[in-house]
Amino acid sequence: MNSIAQTNQSEKQLSEKMQYFLRRYHVSRILRSANAYKLRGLPVLSIFIVAFSTIFAQRSFFMQIHLQPGVIPFAKDTLYRFMNSCHIHWRRFTTTLAATIIQSTIAPLTSADRVNVLILDDSVYHRARSKKVELLARLYDHAKKEFSYGFRMLTLCWSDGNTLLPVNHTLLSTENP
């Protein structure tokens, strides 16, 4: 008698929940609106699903390939080309996805008189051990009151007082060290 591994069951649950999320929020339509089109080979959604699942499986893409050989139908170059494509508007994708989640899930649960706000946060993204990273800057952290090396991460979030949903983010730096 063979026992079923816990990781197999959790991966199946994860896959089902991801499929539900992708269908409910029409991620394929949002990807198309962000100019993510198939040029050749595999559909864009299948590449996105693999990238999305590796994050929630807490593995790198490299480990995913080695742990499950033959399951992923493309090479790592395909994923890296997809993620680094200059034609895909990733900010439009994250903003549209956040708006869809807010309109279809969060807004019906809250009352109409509740005030919605946009929160703009600029935190320091520390890269203390890095020396030769492009555009690495010496920044002053106002919370810790000290200088450190890193980037300024500007984050836009939506909130209704109880729920906080990140809408978009960007890393900022200066060319002056």
Predicted regions and their residues:
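Conserved, well-structured functional cores that handle cations and Mg-NTP chemistry
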Residues: 1-177
